[in-house]
Regions:
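Acidic/aromatic-lined carbohydrate-recognition and catalytic surfaces
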Residues: 1, 7-183
Length: 183
């Protein structure tokens, strides 16, 4: 068996000047394109806004690890089911190559997103369950419509690289989606 060993240095050099940045709970941010909860598209909007204001040396966000495979999902991003994979709630569906490749699905996906996007302009509490359910459905629609050769190769390489860990996680996701008692 092999494993990676991380060792911290005894000391670090300090930068010449203080650094400035922003810390954000990404899920709590909303922009026009978000599905009621901040996602990677929201992070892009935040980064662009910071750049226009003179820049930031860093943006610190909450953990974005995988949560439960299906609703109900844990509200806290600090209690992931695994730290190996990302949470699909943070994927901006409209920014994927598959969305661009399948305009015939845009209306159906917009129907999934529209009621969630209305929440972007309210002070209502965040509701993760409908966002997760809708994003998973949208991503499934796009995947079953077909992915391009380049993305298929990326998926093949990802599956090969992640190996048994990915197989175990996906099997657990399938079981947990059908038996909420497992989560």
């Amino acid at each position: 068996a092999t494993s990676t060993l991380l060792v911290s240095p005894q000391s670090l050099e300090l930068p010449d000047a203080p650094r400035t940045g922003v810390m954000a709970q990404l899920y709590s941010l909303r922009d026009r394109g978000a599905w009621g909860i901040g996602d990677y598209g929201t992070l892009e909007v935040l980064s662009d806004s910071l750049q226009k204001l003179g820049g930031a040396d860093f943006v610190l966000v909450n953990p974005m690890h995988a949560a439960e495979a299906a609703p109900p999902v844990e509200d806290s991003p600090y209690l992931p089911t695994t730290r190996r994979y990302t949470n699909p709630i943070y994927i901006r569906v409209e920014n994927t190559p598959e969305y661009a490749a399948h305009p015939e699905l845009h209306a159906e996906i917009e129907q999934l997103a529209a009621p969630l996007k209305k929440r972007n302009h309210t002070a209502d509490l965040l509701e993760r369950d409908p966002v997760v359910a809708s994003k998973i459905k949208a991503l499934h629609l796009l995947y079953t419509a077909g992915i391009g050769d380049e993305r298929a190769e990326q998926l093949r390489a990802f599956r090969e690289r992640e190996g048994e860990g990915l197989v175990g996680f996906t099997e657990w996701c399938e079981r947990a989606a059908n038996d909420p008692a497992l989560t």
